[in-house]
Design a protein with these regions (language model features):
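Residue-level recognition of single "structural anchor" positions
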Residues: 1-316
């Protein structure tokens, strides 16, 4: 039986728990202390808290780091409450929202810091999902998402179809298990588990097999079409079941992959315009993170906060 999708923390509860900057700062320190503070200089894990400096001092080497250091907020001058509001909205809404909308809601003068804030959080989401591999029966296919033409391609003649400069290639994988004891006119219904979406530069078999090896357990079974891009999958997983799939049958043979692609495209089209190819992965990170944690409810806020305080800032 399908689990009920739980609702996240509502706005009234959020405002009650985090009414001001001070409450957000105190809670952020609680998250850091719970996860453990590590000295970036010597690796020490015991620290003094210097209230007057709002910083940690390593008991081993004496070096200090601020409350924000080595977290998603590293180097940010934005208020703690901005970050808490953004994390609340990202984890409590089914759809996404733009940086321009968040900027408007916060009443902040500059767009760029808010844009960076959201992309850092989306990168945190992606890093978290990288820790887990898919298992069982996996549907696998590629999707093509509309993005801006890269600068180095703008002067070249526009290609059509899958090779268009306005399309970014995405490898999509979904755990898909038949529901026991149930049948429909189209066959056995399938229940989805977790999904992954990874932006790729090409459809070479080496590229696909490498990503499959890093994201799917060896004991899994992979279902796909008979594209030559997938010829090496049989060497990566326990079983690779490929077949010729007519275009109008894709939704029946690989249902969850194409539901995920369709829903992700709809989310992007509804909110964003002219997505740069280099940032598409971050938007897909958000989509997959929410989908994979659709049963977490209010716990999703805590999960993203925990991931944020342990995040090693590598955003470019």
């Amino acid at each position: 039986m399908m689990k009920p999708i739980r609702k996240g923390m509502n706005l009234l509860n959020f405002v009650a728990q985090y009414p001001d900057e001070a409450s957000c700062r105190v809670k952020f320190k609680e998250y850091r202390d719970q996860q453990g503070v590590v000295c970036p200089h010597c690796g020490g894990t015991s620290h003094y808290w210097k209230q007057d400096k709002e910083s940690y001092e390593c008991k081993k080497c004496g070096k200090r780091q601020s409350l924000r250091a080595n977290t998603v907020m590293h180097g940010s001058q934005l208020p703690f409450r901005y970050w808490f509001i953004a994390i609340h909205l990202l984890t409590s809404t089914k759809k996404s929202f733009s940086a321009a909308e968040l900027q408007r809601q916060l009443g902040h003068n500059r767009y760029e810091p808010i844009w960076t804030l959201l992309h850092k959080l989306r990168e945190v989401m992606g890093r978290r999902d990288e820790l887990y591999s898919l298992s069982g029966v996996i549907e696998l296919d590629e999707g093509f998402f509309s993005t801006e033409t890269p600068d180095d391609e703008k002067k070249k003649p526009l290609k059509r179809g899958r090779g268009s400069q306005k399309k970014s290639k995405v490898l999509v994988m979904a755990e898909s298990q038949p529901v026991e004891g149930q049948t429909t006119k189209s066959g056995k219904p399938r229940q989805v588990g977790h999904i992954k979406m990874i932006v790729i530069n090409d459809l070479k078999s080496e590229t696909i097999s490498s990503l499959a090896e890093n994201n799917i357990t060896k004991e899994s079974t992979v279902d796909s079409d008979n594209s030559t891009s997938y010829v090496k999958l049989k060497d990566i997983v326990k079983e690779h079941r490929s077949q010729v799939i007519p275009k109008d049958e894709l939704g029946k043979v690989l249902p969850w992959v194409h539901i995920a692609i369709s829903n992700a495209k709809r989310m992007l089209l509804d909110i964003y315009h002219d997505i740069k190819p280099e940032y598409l992965q971050n938007y897909l990170n958000e989509f997959c993170y929410k989908f994979n944690r659709r049963y977490f409810g209010e716990n999703l806020f805590d999960r993203l906060m925990i991931a944020s305080v342990t995040y090693k800032n590598q955003f470019r």
